Amino acid sequence: HKNLRRDKFRHSSELGYHYITRTLYFSTHKQDIEELEYTASANMPIWAADCPEVFWNAAGEYESMNGRTSTHITVALPKELDCMQRIELSNQLIDEFCGQYQMPYSFAIHNHVSTLDGRYEQPHLHLLYSERSIYDGIERTPELYFQRHCPKNPERGGAKKLTADVIGLGRHQINHYR
C-alpha cells in the first residue's frame, strides 16, 4: 500500500524547481523584468545526478502524503556585489546549510530592478532543498529513497530526514546561518 501525495500537492517540488530555474512553464515568466543569473544543483542521488528535475518529480511522487517534499527559502543578496560575488556568496551559504549534511538541493539567483525607484538591483537567492540526506552513501531507488527511514536496517528504508530538530537547531535554524 503506497501512501502517495494528494494530486493537489503532488508536483509542488517539481514546480518549485521549474520556477526557480525558469524552465518549462516558467521559461517566459517575468522575462521582461527579472534576470536568471545562475542556477545549480548538487548532492543528488545517483539516479538524479545529471537531471535534478527527476529528483524533484520523484519527491512529489513517492514522499508520504503528509511528508514534506522540499523546503524553499528566498534570501536577499547584497546589491553591491557583482554577479560572480553573488554566486560565490550563495555557494558559501548553501555549502554551510546543505553541504555539510549532504542534502540534495537546487538553487538559482534572480535579479530585477526595484519597482519603487527603477534604479537599484534586487538580487535574491532561491534555495530548494530536501531534508532527505545522501550522507549514508546507500544507493536507493527513487521509490525506496522517499520511504520511511529504517534505523536498524538503513538499506531497507528511505534516506534519513535531517530536520532542523534532528541537527539540533530547531526553529532557530535560519538564525544560525545569519
Task: State each model region's role.
Residues 1-178:
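N-terminal nicking endonuclease/strand-transfer module with a His-rich metal-binding environment
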